[in-house]
Every structure is written in C-alpha cells, then in structure tokens.
C-alpha cells in the first residue's frame, strides 16, 4: 500500500506549471479535491486550480516525508510545501507543514489536504500578518 503512496508522491512532486496535463495520470476524471481554502470537483477544475496556483508563485515545491497507509486504497502523505510569492513576505521562501488524505483505486479519486491556512497565507499579509503575530504572542 505504501508503494502507491510513494509513487504518487514522487510523481506529484515532479509536477510544475508545464506538466499539469499529467494530473490525469494521478487522478480520476471525477476526483474530489479539498483543502482549507478550496474545493474542486473533476479533473478539469483540478487542472484549473493548479494552473492558477502555479501562475501566482515564483517557486513551489513539495517535499514528502511520511507515507502512512491506513487501509486498502487509503492513506496519508505528510509533506512540507515551500513556495515564494512576490507579494508575500518580501518574496522570501515560505514553508508550510501539511498532510494529504488520499482514497484511490488505480488513481486517486479523493484528495483532502490539511494545513494551517494562516501559516500558508494570512500570516504573510502585511496588516493581517501583524495582527495574527500579536494574537499569537498574547495567547502563547
């Protein structure tokens, strides 16, 4: 089972803005993809989502470090996403820990990502980021 997860992670990590046509090798036509900020249904919407994602960043990389099968055709991938956006954190590299829950037969038909949306985006916005940092200091 973890062979599927390792192979999926390897292929996913090789994706970039010029290879999104390969999403069809990883996902079914009716894939359901969800993360804390988006929900898309179908390979066409998924391709559009990733096209927009890659268009808005200058660098994007996934480093997978955990491959955890939980049953037949299901499991978790643990990863660190690293990206640069010209308008966030002065274009500095931002790293976000996360995990993906996958359901598959021959290909993935359900993909659910879990990550801290604040660490991904909100904490790096000029005004909102300062407010979040202040709140974290007060609560910590």
Q: What do the predicted segments below correspond to?
A:
Residues 55-61, 69-140:
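A beta-strand edge to alpha-helix "cap/lid" segment located at domain peripheries
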Residues 20-24, 28-73:
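A solvent-exposed, acidic/Ser-Thr-rich amphipathic alpha-helical stretch
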Residues 3-7, 45, 94:
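Soluble or luminal CAZymes and related metallo-dependent hydrolases
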Residues 1, 29, 77-78:
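A short alpha-helix capping/helix-coil boundary motif
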Residues 2-26:
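Short acidic-aromatic low-complexity motifs
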Residues 1-3, 139-140:
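Basic/polar N-terminal segments that are highly enriched at the extreme N-terminus
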């Amino acid at each position: 089972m973890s062979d599927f997860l390792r192979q999926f992670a390897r292929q996913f990590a090789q994706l970039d803005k010029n290879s999104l046509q390969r999403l069809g090798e990883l996902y079914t036509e009716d894939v359901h993809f969800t993360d804390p900020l988006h929900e898309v249904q179908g390979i066409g919407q998924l391709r559009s989502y990733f096209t927009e994602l890659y268009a808005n960043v200058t660098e994007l990389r996934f480093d997978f470090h955990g491959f955890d099968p939980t049953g037949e055709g299901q499991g978790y991938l643990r990863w660190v996403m690293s990206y640069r956006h010209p308008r966030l954190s002065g274009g500095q590299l931002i790293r976000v820990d996360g995990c993906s829950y996958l359901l598959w037969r021959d290909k993935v038909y359900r993909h659910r990502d879990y990550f801290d949306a604040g660490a991904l985006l909100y904490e790096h916005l000029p005004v909102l980021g300062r407010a979040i940092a202040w709140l974290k200091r007060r609560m910590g």
